[in-house]
């Protein structure tokens, strides 16, 4: 089973027809979807054949119930605390595809309840860095990581966002990852550049670092600095990049654990990510 810890929130995706006209109207297409990096990974995993579980906190409100229901319908084992107000993120998509995020995470970072029994049948625990930088969720996530490690689970960390890394502090973040010692560390090219990894070495403390570089080849670096580059197949008719990195994780992680083949796992990750790129928001197209 693949388990994730973190945020389950609403994404309000706004496709702008032009640069915003401040003080007046701008024609747009607006769509509401389930979001949150941890929830996305769990859902994409379930929809593509991997048993998955999501652990987090949502509000005790209609939106929280709706979001949980959408995960359950996808086949995810949903384990949440329902208390407070569910968060939302507004994603502004410019005509050139550039995205801007307006973030209100609500109670997503308020999770403090730890139920170690939820790790009993977990083979992979995936934790976005969003879950490691704000209390009490950060301490809760670390306790789950320790519980999973004690049972032999593979630990995966995603860098999540350059803004998250900068706000937390690069040196502090690298020290945190060093202390966790994850088997897999996932990041994109911008995050890798900020962390100073990729050119000669992977993320300190991680057994395997995987750097996704958009349409360019994906780079994998082992702890002993062995490099592997995998070409990314071009994707036609890209609609939206929201959730593509989460889809990659949902494909890469179970395949890597099952096969121990980095190239095969990267190809699987990109195959699922391509389905998200062709669909609006963090959703899969029809395979």
PLM regions with names:
Residues 45, 188, 245:
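Short, conserved phosphate/pyrophosphate- and ester-handling motifs at nucleotide-, phospho-/glycolipid
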Residues 1-8, 69-81, 93-228:
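Ribokinase/PfkB-type carbohydrate-kinase core domain
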Residues 9-10, 14, 60, 161, ...:
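Short, glycine/acidic-enriched loop or turn micro-motifs at the edges of active sites
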Residues 48, 84-87:
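Short, basic and Ser/Thr-rich N-terminal targeting/leader segments
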Residues 1-55, 62-66, 238:
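Glycine-rich phosphate/adenosyl-contacting loop at the front of the ribokinase-like
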Residues 1-3, 26, 147, 196-287:
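Conserved phosphate-binding/catalytic region of the ribokinase-like
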């Amino acid at each position: 089973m693949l388990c994730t810890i973190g945020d389950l929130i609403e994404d309000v995706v706004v496709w702008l027809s032009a640069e915003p006209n401040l003080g007046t109207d701008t024609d747009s297409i607006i769509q509401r979807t389930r979001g949150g990096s941890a929830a996305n990974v769990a859902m994409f995993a379930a929809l593509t054949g991997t048993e998955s579980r999501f652990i987090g906190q949502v509000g005790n409100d209609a939106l929280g119930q709706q979001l949980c229901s959408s995960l359950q319908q996808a086949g995810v084992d949903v384990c949440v605390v329902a208390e407070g107000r569910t968060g939302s993120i507004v994603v502004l998509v410019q005509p050139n595809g550039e995205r801007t995020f307006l973030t209100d995470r609500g109670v997503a970072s308020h999770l403090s309840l730890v139920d170690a029994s939820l790790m009993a049948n977990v083979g992979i625990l995936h934790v976005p860095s969003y879950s490691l930088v704000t209390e009490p969720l950060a301490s809760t996530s670390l306790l789950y990581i320790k519980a999973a490690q004690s049972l032999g689970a593979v630990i995966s960390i995603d860098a999540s966002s350059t803004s998250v890394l900068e706000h937390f502090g690069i040196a502090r973040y690298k020290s945190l990852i060093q202390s966790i010692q994850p088997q897999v560390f996932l990041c994109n090219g911008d995050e890798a550049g900020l962390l100073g990894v990729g050119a000669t070495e992977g993320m300190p403390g991680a057994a395997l670092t995987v750097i996704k570089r958009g349409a360019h080849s994906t780079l994998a670096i082992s702890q002993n600095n062995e490099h592997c580059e995998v070409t990314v197949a071009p994707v036609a008719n890209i609609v939206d990049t929201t959730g593509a990195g989460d889809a990659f994780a949902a494909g890469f992680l179970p395949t890597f654990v099952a096969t121990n083949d980095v190239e095969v796992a990267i190809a699987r990750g990109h195959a699922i990510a391509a389905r998200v790129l062709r669909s609006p928001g963090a959703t899969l197209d029809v395979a």
